[in-house]
Amino acid sequence: MSSSREMRDLPLVRLPEPYKTKYELYQASSGPNGRIFQLRLSSDQNNGAISPPDLLHHQMLYFSELIPGPQATLPAESDNTAWARACRSLVSFVTWDGESAPTVGQIWMLVYAIFSLRPSEESFRLSLSGAQKDQLYAECNAAGLSTRFPTPVQPQPLYTTIEDVVVSRAAFWQGAGSPLGTRPAWLVPSISGSARKLPSEYPAFPLQYTLTSQLTNRPVHTQHPVRPAKPARGAPIYSRYIPHLDEFFAMDHLDYTNETHLQLFHTWQNDPRVAVNWKEAGTLDQHREYLRKIDEDPHQIAVLARFNNTYFAYFEIYWAKEDHMGTYYPALDWDRGRHSLVGDARFRGPHRAMAWWTSLIHYIFLDEPRTTCVVGEPKATNGPVLGYDAAHGFHVHKWGDLPHKRSAMVRCERVRFFEVVNFGNVTSNGTAKPSKSKL
């Protein structure tokens, strides 16, 4: 067995709020083909942690580190077909004892552990061995957690048939196979307004159109989809465990009737560091009115962000088509944008910025599966913001001359975001880096 020191070197796997359940990796054995691991429920749970509705660990489930497949011959690097790439990908061998296969949720946790260990891997193979493995293969494929091994474009008589399935990092972080309900695990279930049931208990929100026409200093006249109702004021909407900080990042729907929420916004907007860019310094009553208007506006939502239980930032998330952004950019029906400020200077720095920047965009793409682009309008000379955006897959669509500034009209496609971002560790200067394998 590994030493306790080696165990501490392995990353924790933690469910998001409201569960915060902690799981630990244990090395069961080691051999010439690498180490064999088991994911166990930690005996050292933090205060407030609760068990998920279904058992997500399996006492008889073991998996290997990612290692090269057993094939004697691999396709040449010049063959870049899906079949050839899958042949060359690393594989985890998964075994279990007993008469029943693990659940899809338990395989999801195993995949979560592997991506926590190897966040830079875009995909890998799972090779299952145990009772009802064919049924489990089919269930994982049906949930989108995995896909069948690709078929070669041309017959390959020199290669044996591979029954493994392929797991995609992009699919996993979009919520494929999530065991915590019909929405991705990182979206915290919350009631909308005075509703008695979760929106996720109903069919997907229908597509129907309405018209927004307002003649203000930034005129808007556009047809766009009717937007879903916002979560209840004060409700949590997103949560994710950040391994390199050993903290949870979360976002709550700001409640302008809550004096604590209002006072935070008021204090931050009157900070000269914030006011120079936001230009919203004012009285408490002015800020209450500002937030009330956002609360009543279906095209945007005000959000407070926190690490663990300490609020540090304010975000505005908007639908681009009925925003003034739509005047400068040909927004699609479900495109969204965001504005952000860090109000608590203790939480500045690239090691934290990378965590919340990733999470904010992650939330936007998860909240509405039809959102294909996230857009923005940072000041064209704001190098740090443009740098963080670029690290997350954004590119400058064009310059936009707004009444108060020249902006870089940036956009990031869903496909690009989930290709670029690995949700892994970061360096001391905040740039993303692959985790060193601890396996």
UniProtKB/Swiss-Prot annotation:
Compartments, as annotated in UniProt: Peroxisome
Keywords, in A-Z order: Acyltransferase, Peroxisome, Transferase
Recorded GO MF terms: N-acyltransferase activity
The UniProt record lists the keyword Acyltransferase: yes
BP terms from Gene Ontology: siderophore biosynthetic process
Principal cellular location given in the protein's record: other
Leading EC class: transferase
Its EC number(s): 2.3.1.-
One Pfam family named in its UniProt record: Acetyltransf_8
Motif (PTS1-type peroxisomal targeting signal): 437-439
Pathway annotation from the record: Siderophore biosynthesis
InterPro entries for this protein: Acyl_CoA_acyltransferase, Acyltransferase_MbtK/IucB-like
Induction summary: Expression is induced during iron deprivation and is regulated by the transcription factor SRE1.
Taxonomy, superkingdom: Eukaryota
PANTHER family: ACYLTRANSFERASE MBTK_IUCB-LIKE CONSERVED DOMAIN-CONTAINING PROTEIN, LYSINE N-ACYLTRANSFERASE C17G9.06C-RELATED
Family label: Belongs to the lysine N-acyltransferase mbtK family.
Physiological role: Hydroxyornithine transacylase; part of the gene cluster that mediates the biosynthesis of hydroxamate-containing siderophores that play a critical role in virulence via intracellular iron acquisition during macrophage infection.
Name of the molecule in the record: Hydroxyornithine transacylase SID3
Organism this protein belongs to: Ajellomyces capsulatus (Darling's disease fungus)
